[in-house]
């Protein structure tokens, strides 16, 4: 077992999607150049639909929430208050595992956190993400640039689930979306973030420290 990798943890309150994306790109460049440690960002977004590389505008059914094309994999999803977003800026160079293993670790993180609250999460052959029964509770989308990952996962804590009705989530018509709150689990954002950081440390063999 290698020594744990030091990772800086950054918490943001509610961040505009475009601002968060631009910050990721800047930090990825710094990581690539050896000027910054790998970084874990935990935040919530203002309401936005994000379209991955396989998405089309036809996947967005509502016009009252902004839609942004992104460079991540996947199709379309919703981000907004009550949903924990975790961006993982992780240098893959020198690693034995590639992008698929990285995505699998993100999924394991989510399932570990859900299990702590007595919720059984599972993978689905339809694509990356985690489901509870037939309802999706977490989405995952990743891009690698200059050997460093960006984007990551979103876990529905207590968002307005009606906003998911304005899209065809991840291209899957008719499949429901759920949240911890809808499953009867009441958890604060702060507590959920702490659980997610701990799960990240275990799944990625990392040692996290909080940015001031």
Swiss-Prot record:
Positions annotated as active site in the UniProt record: 170 (acyl-thioester intermediate)
CDD domains reported for this sequence: LipB (cd16444)
Site entry: Lowers pKa of active site Cys: 136
InterPro entries: aa-tRNA-synth_II/BPL/LPL (IPR045864), BPL_LPL_catalytic (IPR004143), Octanoyltransferase (IPR000544), Octanoyltransferase_CS (IPR020605)
PROSITE patterns reported for this sequence: BPL_LPL_CATALYTIC, LIPB
Pathway membership: Protein modification; protein lipoylation via endogenous pathway; protein N(6)-(lipoyl)lysine from octanoyl-[acyl-carrier-protein]: step 1/2
A single GO BP: protein modification process
Subcellular localization, as worded in the UniProt entry: Cytoplasm
Pfam family, one: LplA-B_cat
Annotated substrate binding sites: 72-79, 139-141, 152-154
Primary residence: cytoplasm
Domain BPL/LPL catalytic intervals: 34-208
Enzyme Commission number, as recorded: 2.3.1.181
Record-annotated membrane-spanning stretches: none
A molecular-function term among this protein's GO annotations: lipoyl(octanoyl) transferase activity
Keywords: Acyltransferase, Cytoplasm, Transferase
Catalysis: reaction(s): octanoyl-[ACP] + L-lysyl-[protein] = N(6)-octanoyl-L-lysyl-[protein] + holo-[ACP] + H(+)
Keyword set includes Iron-sulfur: no
SUPFAM superfamilies: Class II aaRS and biotin synthetases
Function field: Catalyzes the transfer of endogenously produced octanoic acid from octanoyl-acyl-carrier-protein onto the lipoyl domains of lipoate-dependent enzymes. Lipoyl-ACP can also act as a substrate although octanoyl-ACP is likely to be the physiological substrate.
Family statement: Belongs to the LipB family.
Protein name: Octanoyltransferase
